[in-house]
């Protein structure tokens, strides 16, 4: 199913994969999502500052890490919601009483976003067919209309949050092709998460080995040390197995919409939907607008003798990193470098003249 855009899991960037799989193109990067998260953090900071920048609540707030992003690549539902807004899309919780009153059959929707802890993935309809676009899978998974409602119900039983995406999604080749092509059955995609599990096991065992090695170097080895080492390994295996069991059940649950194990021959073409010039222009306008708004908000919130950058929360935003770099390179540093180069050139010319 090559004409369906499907980003696979890289690190913990599932929010990015979820959005791009929904929109069917490389519409969002980690830097752009971090920019949205930083904007949300700043808006929250300004609201807290209304109670006074010296209040205990405000100072305690500044010490807390961002709730909209972290160093692993996780982004909050607020970031996802704001990212979708400038495409004219909004998300509604599937269990929202107002939504449930409408009595809409899930198969009449266009897409869903699902979340459990720090994992996000998309379920989307192309033409007449539903597909699970979980980035933990090696490829898109067909979900029959009859299985969709049960699939969503099982996700919620497993403590998943399910959100309905409202609005017109960008046009894509997959949607056009699957309006005219009928898909009866297709191969169940392989799990893309096994590699992640093995990497986690390796990290756990390596940590245990390093810890035991350090203790052995300090106090020497003995039979008791060997027993403790084996016990630590066994405990780490049990803990990893518990975590992996949950990961496996999560992946298996996401695959229960599959309706068969054979595939119909379909034309294979490369996806033509990654961000075109028009989406790029829209994105540039969007982020430029938010940057201008943020500058205006900072100017309004700044108090005499206080700079807004002194009151920012811990963040890994690319904007903050760029700001730090620019502050480090002062005019005096540049001038000193120029003076040094000129002095070296003068000495070289003097030596050549004497020769």
Curated annotation (Swiss-Prot):
All copies of the Josephin domain together span 1-180
Name the principal localization, coarsely classed.
nucleus
What positions does the domain UIM occupy? Answer: 224-243, 244-258
Compositional bias of kind Acidic residues = 215-228
Active site (catalytic residues): 14 (nucleophile), 119 (proton acceptor), 134
Question: Tell me, what is an example of a GO biological process annotation in this record?
Answer: positive regulation of ERAD pathway
The subcellular location is: Nucleus
User: Compositional bias of type Basic and acidic residues: which residue ranges?
Assistant: 278-293
What is the reported tissue distribution?
Widely expressed.
Q: Name any one GO molecular function.
A: cysteine-type deubiquitinase activity
Q: Which SMART domains match?
A: Josephin, UIM
Reaction catalysis annotation: Thiol-dependent hydrolysis of ester, thioester, amide, peptide and isopeptide bonds formed by the C-terminal Gly of ubiquitin (a 76-residue protein attached to proteins as an intracellular targeting signal)
Region (Disordered) residue spans: 209-230, 253-331
Report keywords, A-Z.
Hydrolase, Nucleus, Protease, Repeat, Thiol protease, Transcription, Transcription regulation, Ubl conjugation pathway
Q: Which InterPro entries match?
A: Ataxin-3 (IPR033865), Josephin (IPR006155), UIM_dom (IPR003903)
Alphabetized Gene3D superfamilies for the sequence = 3.90.70.40, S15/NS1, RNA-binding
Q: Tell me the PANTHER family matching this sequence.
A: ATAXIN-3-RELATED
Something else known: Identified only in primates. ATXN3L appeared to have arisen relatively recently, just prior to the first major division between hominids and old world monkeys.
Query: Can you say what this protein is called?
Result: Ataxin-3-like protein
Q: Say which species the protein is native to.
A: Homo sapiens
Gene name for this UniProt entry = ATXN3L
């Amino acid at each position: 199913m090559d004409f369906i855009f499907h980003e696979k899991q890289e690190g913990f960037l599932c929010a990015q994969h979820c959005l791009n799989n929904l929109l069917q193109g490389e519409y969002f990067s980690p830097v752009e999502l971090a920019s949205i998260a930083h904007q949300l953090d700043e808006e929250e900071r300004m609201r807290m500052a209304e109670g006074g920048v010296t209040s205990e609540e405000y100072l305690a707030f500044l010490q807390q890490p961002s709730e909209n992003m972290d160093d692993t690549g996780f982004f909050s539902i607020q970031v996802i919601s704001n990212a979708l807004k400038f495409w004219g899309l909004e998300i509604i919780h599937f269990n929202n009483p107002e939504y449930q009153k409408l009595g809409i059959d899930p198969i009449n929707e266009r897409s869903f976003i699902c979340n459990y802890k720090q994992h996000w993935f998309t379920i989307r309809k192309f033409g007449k067919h539903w597909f699970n676009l979980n980035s933990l899978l090696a490829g898109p998974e067909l979900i029959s209309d009859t299985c969709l409602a049960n699939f969503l119900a099982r996700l919620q039983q497993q403590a998943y949050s399910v959100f309905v995406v409202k609005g017109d999604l960008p046009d894509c080749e997959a949607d056009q092709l699957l309006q005219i092509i009928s898909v009866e059955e297709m191969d169940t995609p392989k799990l893309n998460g096994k590699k992640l599990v093995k990497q986690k096991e390796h990290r756990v065992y390596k940590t245990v080995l390093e810890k035991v090695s350090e203790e052995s170097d300090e106090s020497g080895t003995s039979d008791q040390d060997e027993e403790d080492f084996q016990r630590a390994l066994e405990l780490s295996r049990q803990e990893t197995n518990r975590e992996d069991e949950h990961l496996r059940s999560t992946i298996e649950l996401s695959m229960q919409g599959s309706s068969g194990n054979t595939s119909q021959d379909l034309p294979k073409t490369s996806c033509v939907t990654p961000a075109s010039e028009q989406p790029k222009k829209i994105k540039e306008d969007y982020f430029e607008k938010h940057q201008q708004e943020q500058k205006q908000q900072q100017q309004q919130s700044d108090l005499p003798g206080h700079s807004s950058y002194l009151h920012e929360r811990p963040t890994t935003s690319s904007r903050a990193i760029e700001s730090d770099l620019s502050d480090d390179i002062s005019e005096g540093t540049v001038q000193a470098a120029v003076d040094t180069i000129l002095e070296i050139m003068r000495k070289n010319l003097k030596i050549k003249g004497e020769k």
